Curated annotation (Swiss-Prot):
Source taxon at top rank: Bacteria
Localization annotation: Cytoplasm
Gene, per the UniProt record: aroB
Binding site for NAD(+): S72, G73, E74, K75, E76, K77, T130, T131, K142, K151
Gene Ontology terms for molecular function: 3-dehydroquinate synthase activity; metal ion binding; nucleotide binding
Protein name: 3-dehydroquinate synthase
Recorded family membership: Belongs to the sugar phosphate cyclases superfamily. Dehydroquinate synthase family.
Listed Pfam families: DHQ_synthase (PF01761), DHQS_C (PF24621)
Keywords: Amino-acid biosynthesis, Aromatic amino acid biosynthesis, Cobalt, Cytoplasm, Lyase, Metal-binding, NAD, Nucleotide-binding, Zinc
C-alpha cells in the first residue's frame, strides 16, 4: 500500500492507496481521538449495491454503523439530500464524536463532506473513493452541494481524517467513468507534472490500460500535484485556483447540457482544450493544441457541441467562482507545467469560443 501525506494549515492526514487499502480502515478509526461514538456511511444507490456490504464487513468495530443512501447522479448533490442526511444523522443519534464515511465518487464525497462540515458545526469524516475522478475531489477539503444556478455554490472547506483508496472498487466502473476520471489525471499532469504527462502519452494508449500497477502509479503521481498546491493555498485564495484548469468552460457545459448529460471529466476535457486554444492566442505560444486535440479524441472525449449558444456559455462562465465583478477569470497555460489565472473580456471569450466551436466540428 502506498501512503501520500497531505499537509494543510488546518490538518494533516494520509491518502492510503492500494489493493488492500480497505483493510486499513478499522485501524484508522480505532486510533482516532476522541474515540468514535458511531459511524454513518453515506453512499449512492449504484455504489451501495456493489460495495456497501464490503465496506460494512471491513469495519470490524463495536460502534453502531448505519447507512444513508441517495439516488445516483450529479443532480443528487442537492439541498434536499443534504437536509435528509442531517435528518438521518439526528434520528440515528450522531454526536460530535461520530464519524461519517463517504463511500462513492465525487458527488458523494462532496455531499457527505458538507454534511460532516455542518452537522453540529463540524464532525470528522473519511473519504473512501470508488471512482478515478475522486482522486481529485477526495483530497483537499472542498465540499459542497449544487444550486440550480451553479455547481458547488454552497459549501465549505473541511478536511477529511483520511482518504482510503481501495483500488478494487474501481474495477466496476463503466468506461465513461474511467474517461471522466482520467481527464483530471491529465489536468494534474499538465499543470504540475510534465514528466507524468509524457508517461501518460507513452503508457496509456487506451482507457483499459488504467489498471493494476499503472493505476496505482497514476494515483501516486497525480494526487501529490494537488497535495502540493493545497498545502500552499488551502482555501483557494491564490494558486489553488490553478486546479480549475479547464473548469470554467467545463462547468458551463455541465450546467447548459444538464447535470448527468455530460460527465464532469468530459466537460473538463473540452474545457482544457479550449483553455489551450485560447492560451496560444493570448500568450502567442505553441502548445501543440492540434496534437492535444487528437490525443483527447483518441480516448473518446467529446467535441464542443456545435449547436450550443456561445453567448449563453459566456454568461454561464461569468457565474464561475473565479469570476470577479462580472469579469471572466480563466486558468491559462504559458507552458506545460506553467499556468496562471487571467481576466478575459467577454468579447475575447466569445470570439475564441466561436472559433473553437468551428474547429471542433
Amino acid at each position: 500500500m502506498e501512503n501520500i501525506h497531505i499537509q494543510t494549515k488546518s490538518k494533516e492526514y494520509d491518502v492510503h492507496v492500494g489493493r488492500e487499502a480497505l483493510s486499513h480502515l478499522t485501524t484508522l478509526i480505532q486510533k482516532m481521538n476522541p474515540a468514535v461514538s458511531n459511524i454513518m456511511i453515506i453512499s449512492d444507490e449504484a455504489v451501495a449495491s456493489l460495495h456497501l456490504q464490503t465496506a460494512v464487513d471491513a469495519l470490524q468495530v463495536e460502534q453502531k454503523v448505519f447507512s444513508f443512501v441517495v439516488p445516483s447522479g450529479e443532480k443528487e448533490k442537492s439541498f434536499e439530500n443534504f437536509y435528509e442526511a442531517h435528518t438521518s444523522a439526528l434520528e440515528n443519534k450522531l454526536d460530535r464524536n461520530s464519524l461519517i464515511i463517504a463511500l462513492g465518487g465525487g458527488m458523494i464525497g462532496d455531499l457527505a463532506g458538507f454534511v460532516a462540515a455542518s452537522f453540529m458545526r463540524g464532525i470528522r469524516f473519511v473519504q473512501v473513493p470508488t471512482t478515478l475522478l475522486a482522486h481529485d475531489s477526495a483530497v483537499g477539503g472542498k465540499v459542497a452541494i449544487n444550486h440550480p444556478l451553479g455547481k458547488n455554490m454552497i459549501g465549505a472547506f473541511h478536511q477529511p481524517e483520511a482518504v482510503v483508496y481501495h483500488t478494487p472498487f474501481l474495477h466496476s466502473l463503466p468506461e465513461k467513468e474511467w474517461r471522466s476520471g482520467y481527464a483530471e489525471v491529465i489536468k494534474h499532469a499538465l499543470i504540475g507534472d510534465v514528466e507524468l504527462y509524457h508517461w501518460l502519452k507513452e503508457e496509456v494508449q487506451t482507457l483499459t490500460d488504467l489498471r493494476d500497477e499503472k493505476l496505482i502509479h497514476i494515483l501516486t503521481k497525480a494526487i501529490p500535484v494537488k497535495a502540493n498546491i493545497v498545502s500552499q493555498d488551502e482555501t483557494e485564495k491564490g494558486i489553488r485556483a490553478h486546479l480549475n484548469f479547464g473548469h470554467t468552460l467545463g462547468h458551463a457545459l455541465e450546467k447548459e447540457l444538464g447535470y448527468g448529460n455530460i460527465t464532469h471529466g468530459d466537460g473538463v476535457a473540452v474545457g482544457m482544450l479550449f483553455a489551450m486554444f485560447l492560451s496560444e492566442q493570448v500568450y502567442k505560444v505553441d502548445l501543440s493544441y492540434e496534437e492535444m486535440k487528437q490525443w483527447f479524441l483518441k480516448y473518446g472525449y467529446p467535441k464542443m457541441p456545435s449547436d450550443l449558444n456561445v453567448e449563453r456559455l459566456v454568461q454561464l462562465m461569468k457565474q464561475d467562482k473565479k469570476a470577479n465583478a462580472g469579469t471572466i477569470h480563466m486558468v491559462l497555460m504559458q507552458e506545460y507545467g506553467g499556468v496562471n489565472v487571467v481576466s478575459i473580456s467577454d468579447e475575447t471569450v466569445h470570439i475564441a469560443l466561436e472559433a473553437f466551436q468551428k474547429d471542433m466540428v
